[in-house]
Amino acid sequence: MRFNQYSYINFPKENVLSELKKCGFDLQNTANHKDSLETFLRRFFFTYQDTNYPLSILAADKKTDLLTFFQSEDELTADIFYTVAFQLLGFSYLVDFEDSDVFRKETGFPIIYGDLIENLYQLLNTRTKKGNTLIDQLVSDGLIPEDNDYHYFNGKSLATFSNQDVIREVVYVESRVDTDQKGLSDLVKVSIIRPRFDGKIPAIMTASPYHQGTNDKASDKALYKMEGELEVKLPHKIELEKPQLNLVQPQGKAELIAEAEEKLTHINSSYTLNDYFLPRGFANLYVSGVGTKDSTGFMTNGDYQQIEAYKNVIDWLNGRCRAFTDHTRQRQVKADWSNGKVATTGLSYLGTMSNGLATTGVDGLEVIIAEAGISSWYNYYRENGLVTSPGGYPGEDFDSLAELTYSRNLLASDYIRGNEAHQADLEKVKAQLDRKTGDYNQFWHDRNYLLNAHKVKAEVVFTHGSQDWNVKPLHVYQMFHALPTHIHKHLFFHNGAHVYMNNWQSIDFRESINALLTKKLLGQETDFQLPTVIWQDNTAPQTWLSLDNFGGQENCETFSLGQEEQAIQNQYPDKDFERYGKTYQTFNTELYQGKANQITINLPVTKDLHLNGRAQLNLRIKSSTNKGLLSAQLLEFGQKKYLQPYPAILSARTIDNGRYHMLENLCELPFRPEAQRVVTKGYLNLQNRNDLLLVEDITADEWMDVQFELQPTIYKLKEGDTLRLVLYTTDFEITIRDNTDYHLTVDLAQSMLTLPC
């Protein structure tokens, strides 16, 4: 384990003593260190009637137990302090470590022995081997009462609200959209779990079209075969109009009553970060949105109608929209328990909705935590004039996603009454998304949140993985740079795939978000501020560093690609084409081994480099015909240890999100040997070689100069490493699978790779 502590806040000594005293650690600033440590530990072991026993089973050094040490005349030393501290954090002395000074350096332990009271205070705010901070572990065990009131420690809310005796209710928010054109505003179901509290509390809202269930069967039927010919497009410039949003006004009157009438029972799945905040005094709201089970309207996937309906839930929390008790719209309830302050959470589609909500500038949305969210839907299902699939899901497109999330069809009566209209709406979607050309058009323009990034007022926290080929890193990169300069923005850029990171051992992500939300939503005045970029170092396990920016580098490193012309044959023998189509993983493996139709260029790294931003290929290229698809991957090549893209379980159900509440696994990205690691990749239709909005002819056998930016990333390379650039046509995981007989030729002498460093 390595410690990477970003959540700790330096407080004045008087605050430290006061907070310790409130938790029963009655330490005196004038006492000697040894006495203070003993006082601290006897309170620490509050679950024991006889505190001599736990002291007797801890060690002060290799010869002395802690009780014997306290009974001796020996002085407290730094070595003894560290030895005791590591044991309190769950490490076994003489098993996990023998020399505390060596272990302190190996783990990056954040505490430097000196002022013992401040050391002990920081120790309580340090994560244990099993994932909780020490103070959270003690509170979970009953250190302070579960009194349904707020208690703070180091600028973070503690788990002092009951997670058993909570209010569970359902309301139906009246949106300002009418997606199915029935003349009535769509209703959106809101599932609420909130702690009991006499005052007003903030809300954690997860906007998830998956929450009410998914129609996997219908979605699978809507998948496309990726086999087909790359379209030869007529040259033209793409014209667009400013997206429009038509809102509807509330209709009719509804009796105001005191409480919701529908009780929330089980929910399909909660998000463990929300679970963590519930006993800390934050309401949990799960909203599926229009076109989902128990709501009304069509599934408009990603447009501002869908976003508006989610926004209206925040409006309700602030008294600007109504919520009914049921679909009759006869009775309404107010969110009189809400303080009006909201944060959004969730990954993938959920993080996408956070991005979209932020761009509305809605009052009350204080923070978004957008994890692996889409910033422009075109870049999810298309790339540079190509029809593409999200990584791992070949054949998926917008209409199959609409079928997946239109969970109203899971209700038989809704299916009978509404499926015909839903299918008619879906046919319009199929026509608009244009799988023929892969071009950007008005349909995608209406789902581009970057156009409204200037409206963002909330503080923004992103998480994204360098190995996320589902929602590719371009999404967070573009959103990060599109935000207004005065907005506080933060990015956790890890080396995983399309995954959550709130239960990783190596970083105090949950506690950092706690510090932020306690400040922004509960009004605690602290100077807590996350760094702009928190980056997971790819060269070592469990190592995180603070950076000033994502991209924007002034310096570049250029690699020449060779001295000759090389060709990429597009067509495969039928047997190989079929084999790769059945299992794209086989294609990826053989591509990395140099066995596919490809140009492979090994580039020695002659000095340490820190890639930060978008690698760019400058290629002189020609096609043997009037079309061309170019794929590129940049690898670090060579057998060595790399971080793996998916977290592994270190210990099962050891993280307590409250008081024995929603226990979850402690995880981490493994660091183990592999033959290569993908650094970045990209795909380009050569007819869109100069601009996404400009389609140009390709003249057979005529040279073209192409500038081709790959996916943004942050990656460290060391002198002696090897980069491998792979250029090819069809990618059997991502692109259309065109097996026509043509080839691309690259003049390597007139081509180069540029890395921003």
UniProtKB/Swiss-Prot annotation:
Keywords: Aminopeptidase, Cytoplasm, Hydrolase, Protease, Serine protease. It is found in: Cytoplasm. Its main location: cytoplasm. Its EC number is 3.4.14.11. GO terms for cellular component: cytoplasm. It holds the Pfam family PepX_C. This is Xaa-Pro dipeptidyl-peptidase. The gene is pepX.
